[in-house]
């Protein structure tokens, strides 16, 4: 039997995975395990290996705060979003389509988190892809933002048919206890230009492949592309893409869609609804990981707040286990004062 609880106006259902036929479509029901040690964070004691780094990752397009959405305007949605985030309390969160004032308000209402974000560009309205992380567990080693264009290092630059600047914000995070590092990339691709989406995923995967250390990584974002589209197939390593002046290009590190790893045949996968109950069957949002990462669970959350949604997209949540990286591989993550002593080889 489903039991319903209320938390400051939030409505969510509690069910175990075994009780749910369609695990992607219940309200506030992310409860993959029966034992919960912290709201929104599952205990991995019986399911995950004792080694490696276990993470709870969320991706969420929160809709730009200046949109004239009536009862779904940001001033009404702000509390819904913050209650959702505080309820699930992800280790790392990738937000898309966030304006500066939205990031500032979320930072205030989300205690214990720090964020990595692109710098402001004078005279340009930038929809940020901000990365929030649990500051009690992680510290920020590196961060950056590049712009999907022929001049990716120039803030505000556009290209390939983008009607507005499109970015990727990335961060290298270090877990304080294990001192294990990983990269986190967060993107929002153009919604109109197919050429832009193709060029963007090729540039993105080449950028990831050239990262300065062999740490594992997570990729989140709104790709504005369905599961059968060429950019998504490219990311999964299923097809190459033909790029001008480059010919056919393949993804050097094929990725897994964390939701499809767990639910390969589920049909209820839409993540964009446009505030409609009978929403479009379109899924532009993903959390990707390389094959070395273990996917423990994944969900598309369908939250309601007094008959209203927090955003025009549904958030995604996944539980993953990152592989162990040797101490020598992680050594470069720290300053000289922070570097742990490496044991001599036998």
Regions found by a protein language model. Give the residues of each.
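Short, solvent-exposed loop/turn segments at secondary-structure boundaries
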Residues: 69-73, 158, 194-198
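Glycine-rich, phosphate-binding/catalytic loops in enzymes
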Residues: 74-76, 109-112, 201-203, 234-238, ...
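Metal-dependent phosphoester-hydrolase catalytic domains
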Residues: 6-47, 137, 195, 206-217, ...
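Active-site beta-strand/loop signature of hydrolases that rely on acidic residues for catalysis
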Residues: 56-62, 81-106, 132, 171, ...
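Short catalytic/ligand-binding loop motif for oxyanion handling, primarily in non-cytosolic enzymes
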Residues: 65-68, 101-104, 123-128, 141, ...
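Structured beta-strand-rich core segments of catalytic domains in phosphoester-bond hydrolases
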Residues: 16-17, 21-49, 92-185, 189, ...
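A generic structural micro-feature
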Residues: 52, 124, 160-165, 278-280, ...
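N-terminal, active-site-proximal structural segment of metallo-dependent hydrolase catalytic domains
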Residues: 2-109, 120-127, 322-346
